[in-house]
């Protein structure tokens, strides 16, 4: 297998540092930061109705979620290059502070506008944390080892996604919805303390003036990217709900959004330090894996948003019960990712795992087409396990080969681009299946629902909005109508899963374009960990271990 690790770029080669107490405490801080950033993507779901009623948000309720999604997607893309300019430690500290400030504002919100402002600030911090966590790991361990640590961070993310809705419901019911934001302060604070106290990484530009560094920021690219993503998210938020897909209010912002992204890509050839260097996309392996990250994330959100519709509308589950019924996906993704990371570290191979991952996802989505009222618990659980294992494998084995194909100087921008593509895929992971579902539901309602009143409730996005146990069960006194409604959901969802198979197939075929690179066992980076300053070493080791004679602070 050819070694493509040399790119003609001068890099500092080091043996990976010893993994003593300092290393593990820093990694703990990174894991905590990842957990708290992921928590805010899910904790609000069960509290949203209460928040909306308390603040009188009405039709603005969707933006309580979308402002966070928008700002985190943009910040995840731009913070990689900013960390090259201002240093990893400074940007990580700033990201945690921004996230904490946004959490405090959200928790103290007195109206919807204040909450939206807080959520936007939170997203800027949360998206930055997600990218910087991966970048810091890349600076701390060799490329060969990164899969294991990526798997552990993935486990932290999955844990947050699982416990988030439960925590949100618990706080809302027993304390106050405001504590779903306030709880972030001590968690982020503990991570911030460890980062500020322990993290020391090299910054090649530490002698450059702040003004000169500010001038190197890709201001034009950031503006175009923000406008493009905002327009697309605006269109997808309106599509099928506020306005039909055929409405100019949906089509125009969508077109403008794509034009904005095309303008961003064209502009990236101009600045000396672009947010997403075009050389990343000229590399076949990196470009392919960026697309695979988009598809993987799209499919994960596809499944996690549309299986609950099946559970509630077809299997008659409550919203809380449907969240529990998603546990087979949530609890297998992280372990599968960790195992894949360990095997990748031991063997240095990743392509075979990618084939296996996408094959399992394809099989699972094919099996989802069999779901109906008669599907047993064992069957839908097994289908989810296959999908969870596949997504865990694909997630963990995605970033290391990207970085293996690029010079170490592109670690931050390559990582940021990979995470941006994941986040961008998540945006489409609800929009595409919703469009498929609503189109099929409209056709079926016209063909199979005779009652014009009931038909009116199910067309134009109504079936998607009313996919609840309460709605379907309200027709118990009219068994024929209830059977027809359940049949509408089964057939519409079957088409959703059939379309997902096509995306899985594209992901599998893209695996053939990924080259085999050597995963370097040495740590080549300009941003690696510095030796600890003696004062900090004595202070922190004493604080943690109370003067133990066997300090392992390296």
From Swiss-Prot:
What is the protein's name according to its record?
Acurin A biosynthesis cluster MFS-type transporter
Q: Report the source organism.
A: Aspergillus aculeatus (strain ATCC 16872 / CBS 172.66 / WB 5094)
Gene3D superfamilies listed in its UniProt record: MFS general substrate transporter like domains (1.20.1250.20), Multidrug resistance protein D (1.20.1720.10)
* Family annotation (CDD domains): MFS_Azr1_MDR_like
Please describe what this protein does: MFS-type transporter that may have a role in the biosynthesis of acurin A, a highly reduced polyketide coupled to a serine via a peptide bond; either in extra- or intracellular transport.
Q: Which SUPFAM superfamilies match?
A: MFS general substrate transporter (SSF103473)
* GO CC annotation: plasma membrane
Matching entries from PROSITE patterns are given as: MFS (PS50850)
Family indicated by similarity: Belongs to the major facilitator superfamily.
